[in-house]
Amino acid sequence: MKKSTLINSGISYLVATLGHTDEITICDAGLPIPDHVQRIDLALTHGVPSFLDTVRVILSESQIEGVIIAEEFSDVSPVLHEALLKELSKESEETGKSIEIKYVSHEAFKARTEQSRAVVRTGECTPYANVIFQAGVVF
């Protein structure tokens, strides 16, 4: 059995095969997922697993250099938005690498998911709890 934090085989494979600048979307239970993009559906029930728990686990296994977030997230769900920024800041401090944060409209965010290698759907039911991770390099 795998010893590290991430034991989901689909996400583990995805992270292992990411190239520089590839994108992964982590989303709430309601975000539409394009038909042609791989769907990794973790949602069990409302709030399980949570958006933040999923973000933390994926960050523990992958190097990112940027994120894309919907502008509406900070206005509509400020507590969870701040918690996400805190996790990104912590990751940046631990790795010594900066993480660029880009804000776009929710409509532009949904369109951008078309470029994702995969969309990881959580059970989160907080509005706009979505983020796109852009893969970085570990060297």
From Swiss-Prot:
A GO biological-process term: D-ribose catabolic process
Any one Gene Ontology molecular-function term assigned to this protein's record: D-ribose pyranase activity
Main location: cytoplasm
Segments traversing the membrane: none
Domain of life: Bacteria
Coiled coil: none
InterPro entries cross-referenced by the UniProt entry: D-ribose_pyranase (IPR023064), RbsD-like_sf (IPR023750), RbsD_FucU (IPR007721)
Residues bound to substrate: 28, 106, 128-130
Active site: 20 (proton donor)
The protein's name: D-ribose pyranase
